[in-house]
Each structure stands twice: as structure tokens, then as C-alpha cells.
Amino acid sequence: MTQDVTSGYSNLDLDLRDNGVCVVTLNRPDKRNALDVATIEELVTFFSTAHRKGVRAVVLTGAGDHFCAGLDLVEHWKADRSADDFMHVCLRWHEAFNKMEYGGVPIIAALRGAVVGGGLELASAAHLRVMDQSTYFALPEGQRGIFTGGGATIRVSDMIGKYRMIDMILTGRVYQGQEAADLGLAQYITEGSSFDKAMELADKIASNLPLTNFAICSAISHMQNMSGLDAAYAEAFVGGIVNTQPAARERLEAFANKTAARVRPNS
């Protein structure tokens, strides 16, 4: 199973652990893990099948000192693409990131260094984001004479608000530290390693039931795009399926018998 999941990749380094946590590392450190066409194709391939191949959670990180510096601008410049060609490049980015957000496998992004342009768009498709003290966020497209093409107008806008996102693109404004976390660019900020914290979260999440995680990571995103009435109906429908699965009944029985772990306040 592990061989099927992790083989055949050049720009991604994959490590599937025994508990179903798969570490996915962007492996272009000399380019600050910039996203070229080949890397996007590998992201599409991996996230298209991860949920069917025993992956229970993903920790997404980057090799070297940076998470991801965004679109490979040198490749884009050398390709001298037509408008039609680049539109289809953007659509492929959307396919990769939609498979991440809606694929049903929880993704925790371990961020450090540059989370810039398309790198921020990539991070925004993860369900949880953990930043360390070196992490900085930017959307420098305005200064480069280009426009976003990987979902910043949707996901980054949802995270921090439309006008903050516009400010980042227009002015190149950089966010980092506690301010970035407070704005919603990351849910966790660590003094130490963002990877270690992401792994801690992934280990905990991987112990959840797969169908429950699938509903949390897929159904909620779909419901956000529905009217309130439709979302309420969908929530009831999904809840009916998830809350009556046999494995859930086993966990409820443990709760009823007082053998399940209790929810306690943070110490």
C-alpha cells in the first residue's frame, strides 16, 4: 500500500507513517519550493487518490527554509504562454487545491519562511495551518504585474476578508508573527518547530474515524457554498450517515460506559 501511495513523484517527497499520517514535502528547495507545472500535476495525482489509499491525515511542508514561494515565475516567463494557455494552467491549480479542500483527508500545513503568492494559495487549501516565528505571508502579484490564479480571491479572502486581501495584492503588504495568526492566516503559531506541532495535530486527527474526518473536511466546505436552508438540510443528511456508523456506536458505547477520554480544559 505504501509503495502505491508514495512512488512515482519527483517534486514531492512522500512518507506514509504506520498510523496513516502522510508527510508531503514540496521538494524544490533551490527554488524555495516554487510551484511549476510538474509540481501541480503531482499534487493533483496525490490528492485525487489519497483518501482511497490509507491516508488518514496529511502534513504538508516544504524542504529547506521556506514553505513555498508561489508560482515558478521563471518557468512562466520562459514559457511565454498565451492567455488561453495560462487560463488552463490556473484551472489545473484550482483542480489541485479543490481536491485538497474537498477531498476529505485532513491536511495540516506546516509553515515556515516564505508563504508567498501561490504558496499562500496552497496553504489556504489546507484545513489547518501552523506557522513558526520565521513565517511570513505576502501576495506580491501586483508588484510583478500579474494577478492571482490559484484561489486567493476566494480562500485568502475568506480567511482575512476581501479588503485585507486586496491590500496585500495592491501594496505587497507582508504579515508575520502574532498579527498574521490573529488575522486568521494560521490557526496555530509556535515558538518551536511548526512541523512538530503539525505532526502532533495530525497524529490526533488520524485517530478519528475516517468517515467523520471526511465529513468534517469535505461536507463543511460544501455547506459554506449553500444557502442556509440547503446547508441545514445537508448537515442533517450527513449527520444521519456519520452519526449512525457502527464504529461511532462503539465510541458512544465507551462514552456511555465512562471508559472514553473526558473533555477537559487546557491546563
From Swiss-Prot:
| EC number(s) from the headed UniProt entry | 4.2.1.155
Catalytic residues (UniProt): 121, 141
Q: Which Pfam families match?
A: ECH_1 (PF00378)
EC top class named in words: lyase
The cross-references to CDD domains, in alphabetical order and at most eight, read: crotonase-like
> SUPFAM superfamilies attached here?
ClpP/crotonase (SSF52096)
Residue positions binding 3-(methylsulfanyl)acryloyl-CoA: 31-32, 69, 71, 73, 118, 144, 149
Q: Which reaction does it catalyse?
A: 3-(methylsulfanyl)acryloyl-CoA + 2 H2O = methanethiol + acetaldehyde + CO2 + CoA; 3-(methylsulfanyl)acryloyl-CoA + H2O = 3-hydroxy-3-(methylsulfanyl)propanoyl-CoA; 3-hydroxy-3-(methylsulfanyl)propanoyl-CoA = 3-oxopropanoyl-CoA + methanethiol; 3-oxopropanoyl-CoA + H2O = 3-oxopropanoate + CoA + H(+)
Q: Name one GO molecular function term.
A: hydro-lyase activity
Q: Which Gene3D superfamilies match?
A: 2-enoyl-CoA Hydratase, Chain A, domain 1 (3.90.226.10), Lyase 2-enoyl-coa Hydratase, Chain A, domain 2 (1.10.12.10)
Q: Give any single GO term for biological process.
A: fatty acid beta-oxidation
Tell me what effect the entry lists for residue 141 to A: Abolishes catalytic activity
Ordered alphabetically, the record's keywords are:
Lyase
Knockout consequence? Cells lacking this gene do not grow on methylmercaptopropionate (MMPA) as the sole source of carbon. Growth is severely inhibited on dimethylsulphoniopropionate (DMSP).
NCBIfam families, sorted: PRK08150.1 (NF006013)
Quaternary arrangement and interactors, per the entry?
Homohexamer; dimer of trimers.
What family, per the record? Belongs to the enoyl-CoA hydratase/isomerase family.
Describe the task this protein carries out: Involved in the assimilation of dimethylsulphoniopropionate (DMSP), an important compound in the fixation of carbon in marine phytoplankton, by catalyzing both the hydration and the hydrolysis of 3-(methylthio)acryloyl-CoA (MTA-CoA) to acetaldehyde, CO2, MeSH, and CoA.
UniProt protein name? Methylthioacryloyl-CoA hydratase
Species the sequence originates in: Ruegeria pomeroyi (strain ATCC 700808 / DSM 15171 / DSS-3) (Silicibacter pomeroyi)
